[in-house]
Amino acid sequence: MKFIIKLFPEITIKSQSVRIRFIKILTSNIRNVLSTLGDDITVVRHWDNIVVVSKDESKSEAVCDALTRIPGIHHFLQVEEHSYTDLHNIFEQTFAAFGHLVENKTFCVRAKRRGKHSFTSNEVERYVGGGFNQHVESAKVKLTRPDVTINLEIEDDKLILVNARYEGIGGFPIGTQEDVLSLISGGYDSGVSSYMLMRRGSRVHYCFFNLGGSAHEIGVKQVAHYLWNRFGRSHKVHFVAVDFEPVVAEILEKIDDGQMGVVLKRMMVRAASRVAERYGVQAIVTGEALGQVSSQTLTNLRLIDNATDTLILRPLITHDKENIINIARQIGTEDFARTMPEFCGVISKNPTVKAVKAKIEAEEEKFDFSILDSVVENAKNMDIRRIAEETVQQVTEVEMVSEFATNDVVLDIRSPEEQENSPLKLEGVDVKELPFYKLSTQFGDLDNSKTYLLYCERGMMSRLQALYLREQGFNNVKVYRKK
């Protein structure tokens, strides 16, 4: 099993020294991610590609899945490598591998060549294509938009047959740019903005301002862990949780209603700046988009920026909501965001869209800044890899079972795609399907005389959701784990 990884085009136009540095970092990132699949996978870097080889064919699907989610990869090819003797031998091997694909189809042959040979790339394409055309009567050559494209590469004395091409997510390798701190709320915007900075090469740490209790924190941790595990697990990152309820209480008590939204955001960036400074992070990332809500007008954004000297990045500033939701759907955070409550918008009934600096500063003079100092000082920092471990500790009161009682119902909370691809079949118990993102709104509609055993593939999501339901007052919930 061999994969040839092609670099994101912007990497290839860098100077020689920068290009080499980027390729080294990308190679290291790939090794870090693939190391979880075993130590038999080798990763070798070259000037214009990176080669991944494993002798274990059973890992092919897992390797493909991992490579499609590593920033810095434009696309990669799953290939077979052979030696060859001459042009006719190239045709014979190519036809043996792909001849059956062109029956009753239009096709073309595309060849790339590196090294010194007695033939050109065009000659290879014509010879191999002509051979296909002669040996398969139902096939027809079509150079533009054919049904089948036969791809092959010739490198010195090696023939490389391309079995499949997979698209990567592009961008720069994580670690080529400086670290950032994302203010994550669990909604559409903060998840997408975090992803966009990871894709641009920054290691993204997460800062969460808790306004809604432990249930809110559990939900946001799910999103942050998902983003890290899916796109950024080549690096260690921090998850910092700040209990912001005392700050909100002080704002509600002392700040004029119309100024509350801007003041709250200014307090958040002040706190985030201190957290960023503590960990040597260069910039803050937010999911703000121009004009989306009252605090996101140019006037208000400028006042929010004035509260700190730390750079604030807003990758979604010109995006509309529909586009943001589409990206969230593509990266897999839409289901989380759909049921995540928005707490910032509930504290002000008549927010100003054009705050005045003098008024904001006058209102902030009423604020007891020792409260802000205290919540930052007591902020909880954890390695994001420990979220799964912490979840296990948190839900010790939630029973885990592998056998069924008379009144039990197994609730498959995986996504519809996972349920369809790998149906849960159990004997002696009723199995119902309810995706995790619908639990908060539909669990209460279930028969409360039953005990529900939550099931997911790895157990982490079911534990988090069990704790979340317990927080809502549902005690008829356990976690099901297969024997």
UniProtKB/Swiss-Prot annotation:
Alphabetical keyword list: ATP-binding, Cytoplasm, Disulfide bond, Nucleotide-binding, Redox-active center, RNA-binding, Thiamine biosynthesis, Transferase, tRNA-binding
Pfam families registered for this protein in UniProt: Rhodanese, ThiI, ThiI_fer, THUMP
Gene Ontology BP annotations: thiamine biosynthetic process; thiamine diphosphate biosynthetic process; thiazole biosynthetic process; tRNA 4-thiouridine biosynthesis
EC number, as in UniProt: 2.8.1.4
GO CC annotations on file: cytosol
Disulfide bonds: C344-C456
EC supergroup of this enzyme: transferase
Catalytic activity: [ThiI sulfur-carrier protein]-S-sulfanyl-L-cysteine + a uridine in tRNA + 2 reduced [2Fe-2S]-[ferredoxin] + ATP + H(+) = [ThiI sulfur-carrier protein]-L-cysteine + a 4-thiouridine in tRNA + 2 oxidized [2Fe-2S]-[ferredoxin] + AMP + diphosphate; [ThiS sulfur-carrier protein]-C-terminal Gly-Gly-AMP + S-sulfanyl-L-cysteinyl-[cysteine desulfurase] + AH2 = [ThiS sulfur-carrier protein]-C-terminal-Gly-aminoethanethioate + L-cysteinyl-[cysteine desulfurase] + A + AMP + 2 H(+)
Subcellular localization, as worded in the UniProt entry: Cytoplasm
Catalytic residues identified in the record: C456
Family membership: Belongs to the ThiI family.
Function: Catalyzes the ATP-dependent transfer of a sulfur to tRNA to produce 4-thiouridine in position 8 of tRNAs, which functions as a near-UV photosensor. Also catalyzes the transfer of sulfur to the sulfur carrier protein ThiS, forming ThiS-thiocarboxylate. This is a step in the synthesis of thiazole, in the thiamine biosynthesis pathway. The sulfur is donated as persulfide by IscS.
Name of protein: tRNA sulfurtransferase
